[in-house]
Design a protein with these regions (language model features):
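Short phosphate-binding loop-to-helix
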Residues: 21-82
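N-terminal glycine-rich phosphate-binding loop and ensuing alpha1 helix
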Residues: 1-18
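Hydrophobic/aromatic residues located in beta-strands of well-ordered beta-sheets
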Residues: 14-16, 62, 127
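Short, high-confidence coil segments that cap the C-terminus of an alpha-helix
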Residues: 11, 57-59, 86-90
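Conserved core of the sugar-phosphate nucleotidyltransferase
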Residues: 72-173
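Short secondary-structure boundary/capping elements
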Residues: 16-19, 43, 180
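Donor nucleotide-sugar recognition loop
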Residues: 174-180
């Protein structure tokens, strides 16, 4: 997915950042450079920043694809890069769930409650809140199902893009009580 999304760009480097030698070896076997990062890093964003800082000339943008979310909607990576290039400091795509996908997410959460992240958005599309709970609560769901093909639930796809300085600021912040 990542290779296809950047195939026409010579200004983008694809690098796997991991603290697991097996993952690094697999990436290298697949022809992708890999860098080892400190296992004490708590987040993928921290790992992505550590990898970016290994390069003599730091990148303008850093994109972090969660290792547990390798399958992305077509165009997601390109959209993140386009948002960053047009001035966004942070870009992270979400997709509107149709009712069947929402039902599947609900079923999956019965077995794995902390999997999958949903997003509540402002009318302008800006993310207001991310949650492991399915948000928003849906009133009069039967009526909505009958009239709308899409549910009001947006799912985060596990892709984060940052201007390098925005990522530095983000990683300098301590986790909040709600993140723990």
């Amino acid at each position: 997915m990542a290779r296809a999304a950047i195939s026409d760009r010579d200004d983008v480097a694809l690098v796997v950042a991991t603290d697991d030698e097996d993952i690094a070896a697999h990436a290298r076997e697949a022809g992708c450079p890999a860098v080892m990062t400190d296992s004490a890093l708590a987040t993928g964003s921290g790992r992505a920043l550590a990898a970016a800082l290994l390069f003599a000339e730091g990148p303008r943008f850093v994109v972090n694809l969660q290792g547990d979310s390798p399958f992305q909607p077509e165009g997601a990576l390109g959209a993140v890069l386009a948002a960053l290039e047009s001035g966004a400091e942070v870009a992270t795509p979400v997709i509107a769930l149709d009712w069947e996908s929402l039902d599947a997410l609900r079923e999956h959460k019965l077995l794995s409650p902390f999997s999958g992240t949903t997003c509540v958005r402002a009318p302008n599309g800006r993310a207001l809140w991310f949650s492991k709970a399915i948000l928003p609560a849906i009133r009069d769901e039967d009526r909505l199902r009958a009239t709308d093909g899409l549910s009001p639930v947006w799912r985060h796809v596990g892709l984060y893009g940052y201007q390098l300085e925005a990522l530095r600021r983000f990683e300098a912040c301590a986790p909040t009580m709600l993140e723990r």
